């Protein structure tokens, strides 16, 4: 017996009904981005693995556990992209776009992470991604956060989310804080989870993200980053808060919200929800002024961005999306097909969606049409062909018309 082929675990087909929702989400988000000056771009799904090794760090969960990386036929290590930001910055550098800064980019498409599949978390999933590159300052961060809010509003889910906000401060603030955090955690080293013990020496701030209950109890009394802000860091965060208040953006300051990579600074944020269980983050981002230099640029490039998971957005609510119902053309006999094709072609040039139903018995063809919940059927038989007419049945009104092409066009475009 032939093996029944299935998609890989954690990877799903997007069938038409799924794709309709995805397309709706993408179009809504794109339209909001246009109002903020964002332009769409695309990068390859496959990149050299070193692009992500540099951007995420080899000790990160994504690189050490989740990345799809393999040796290609040229003996190069390549990877399916696990996120967009590194790809966008790589593109900025390789296309020498630095002299055109500032730039605002919108991207969308699949990303890949080898994770345990569950509701709202797949191994292939799709993201909306926004990057504002070459602009610094709290005003830029406020504008980016307002963009995120407006996207969630356009998708009718903003009311079910909470903006969690924090400042990572400047390099000096984080350096002092990291030292104090390590001193505190060293006293509990034997009680930490195995994963956090590894992070303690490589990336201690990532311990604050730990899901371990034991770790969380220890972290509850750990020093807080805001206690070590420089004056510059305090002023930056206070300015951001002022702008958000002016814009009417609601937020909750979460002092434990961090990013564990050195190139992140100042603003970090997540939009979370209680509607999706453990997969509570809908949209997340932050400022990453140090990434471009890590990836080979001569200088640091200020930047801020965020990504949102399309599948998670789709789980937040049901979208009633109207779609164009095609008109069905049904030639009665084989000798009516040529005339039917002429009619179909003429109607399509008038931007009317048409499906020709010519296969099988009339009863089966009619059943397929009923299953599509169509409104109009055009019957073409010998009489219609001889008189150069069309018989149109309106299934919703239960009415029938025999008209010429011009009248048919008028009727179908109402």
Swiss-Prot record:
Q: Principal localization?
A: cytoplasm
Task: Print the keywords alphabetically.
Answer: Aminoacyl-tRNA synthetase, ATP-binding, Cytoplasm, Ligase, Nucleotide-binding, Protein biosynthesis
Q: Where in the cell is it found?
A: Cytoplasm
Sequence similarity: Belongs to the class-II aminoacyl-tRNA synthetase family.
Q: What is this protein called?
A: Histidine--tRNA ligase
The record's GO CC annotations read: cytoplasm
Q: Give its E.C. classification number.
A: 6.1.1.21
Provide the organism lineage as a comma list. Answer: Bacteria, Pseudomonadati, Pseudomonadota, Alphaproteobacteria, Rickettsiales
Name a biological process GO annotation.
histidyl-tRNA aminoacylation
PROSITE patterns, alphabetized:
AA_TRNA_LIGASE_II (PS50862)
Spans traversing the lipid bilayer: none
Single annotated GO MF: ATP binding
Which NCBIfam families does the UniProt entry name for this protein? Answer: hisS
């Amino acid at each position: 017996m032939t093996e029944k082929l299935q998609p890989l675990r954690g990877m799903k087909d997007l069938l038409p009904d799924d794709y309709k929702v995805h397309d709706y989400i993408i179009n809504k988000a794109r339209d909001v981005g246009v109002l903020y000056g964002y332009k769409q771009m695309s990068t390859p799904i496959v990149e050299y693995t070193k692009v992500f090794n540099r951007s995420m760090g080899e000790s990160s969960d994504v690189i050490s556990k989740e990345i799809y990386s393999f040796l290609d036929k040229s003996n190069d290590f390549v990877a399916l992209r696990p996120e967009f930001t590194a790809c966008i910055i790589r593109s900025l550098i390789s296309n020498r776009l630095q002299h055109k800064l500032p730039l605002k980019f919108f991207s969308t498409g699949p990303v890949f992470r080898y994770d345990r599949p569950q509701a709202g978390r797949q191994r292939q999933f799709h993201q909306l991604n926004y990057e504002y590159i070459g602009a610094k300052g709290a005003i830029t961060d406020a504008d980016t956060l307002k963009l995120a809010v407006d996207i969630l509003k356009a998708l009718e889910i903003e009311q079910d989310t909470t903006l969690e906000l924090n400042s990572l401060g400047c390099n000096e603030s984080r350096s002092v804080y990291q030292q104090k955090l390590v001193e505190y955690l060293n006293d509990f080293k034997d009680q930490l989870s195995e994963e956090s013990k590894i992070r303690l020496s490589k990336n201690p701030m990532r311990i604050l993200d730990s899901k371990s209950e034991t770790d969380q109890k220890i972290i509850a009394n750990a020093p807080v980053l805001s206690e070590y802000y420089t004056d510059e860091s305090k002023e930056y965060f206070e300015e951001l808060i002022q702008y958000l208040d002016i814009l009417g953006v609601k937020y909750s300051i979460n002092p434990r919200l961090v990013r564990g990579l050195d190139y992140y600074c100042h603003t970090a944020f997540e939009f979370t929800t209680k509607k999706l269980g453990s997969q509570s983050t809908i949209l997340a981002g932050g400022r990453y002024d140090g990434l471009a230099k890590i990836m080979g640029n001569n200088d640091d490039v200020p930047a801020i961005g965020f990504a949102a998971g399309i599948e998670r957005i789709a789980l937040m609510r049901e979208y009633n999306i109207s779609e164009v119902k095609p008109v069905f053309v049904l030639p009665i006999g084989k000798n009516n097909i040529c005339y039917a094709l002429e009619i179909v072609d003429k109607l399509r040039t008038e931007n009317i969606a048409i499906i020709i139903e010519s296969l099988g018995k009339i009863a089966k063809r009619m059943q397929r049409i009923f299953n599509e919940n169509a409104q109009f059927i055009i019957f073409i038989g010998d009489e219609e062909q001889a008189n150069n007419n069309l018989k149109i049945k309106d299934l919703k009104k239960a009415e029938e018309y025999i008209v010429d092409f011009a009248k048919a066009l008028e009727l179908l475009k109402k």
